[in-house]
Amino acid sequence: MMLQRADGLFTSVSRSDADVSDAKALWQDVYCGEFGWLGVGSDPRADKYHQRSLYAVCRVNGGLPVGTLRIVHEDDPGFYITEKLGTAPISRYLSKGIEVQRLMVRKEFRDRRLPEAPFGIYGVLVKVCLYHALAVGAEWVLADCHRDIDIGPLKSMKAMGFEETGHSYRDSINDEECIVLIIETKQWISNTLRNRSRFNKYLVPDDPAIRMET
């Protein structure tokens, strides 16, 4: 699936070699180089979630990757969250849910607004997540978010309607507390239609600046 934007920013969602390679580059630049959370050479292809994942990659200036997230589809052995918590605490969400992992934006683009990304690269990635949930019929979106890290989007996610499940765990990559969040897709759409904020108007899948390809 391709979300194509006219003014130099485009976002692709796939498991193509190009998207996975650019996701890997961002993992290395952000999670390894900037924060020291991953080892040199960490590769999305090397873990057990890769074969049932899609990678959203935002690119600008003819191809520079500036943001990414991974969308994992449910299957045995579950999600990263269930690896940490077990399946019992969130079992009702698993059969028709997706998990969002490894959302990151290159440092120099975190606070930038572009004509085609009025809420920044993070806003584009959130929109991708909603579009994908609707496209595949996912009823729930699971996510986790560091509670005490300044760049974490916990406040923004809760403002969109994500709710804390009451469960948390220590992230193995940095020993920080991660809060497990959940949103029902139909509730997310309802929220965006009921509360017509600028961001919600941007999120609703009725955007002439975006072309979706399958």
Ranges and model annotations:
Residues 57, 63-73:
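Conserved beta-strand in the GNAT
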Residues 84-178:
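Acyl-donor binding region in acyl/amide transferases
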Residues 19, 33, 59-63, 131-140:
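Secondary-structure boundary elements
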Residues 172-200:
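C-terminal "cap" of GNAT-fold acetyltransferases
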Residues 38, 70, 74-86:
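A short, polar/charged loop-to-alpha-helix boundary motif
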Residues 198-214:
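Short, cationic low-complexity segments
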Residues 1-45, 50, 55-57:
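Short amphipathic alpha-helix that is part of the acyltransferase structural core
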Residues 60-63, 108, 184-188:
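Short loop segments at secondary-structure junctions
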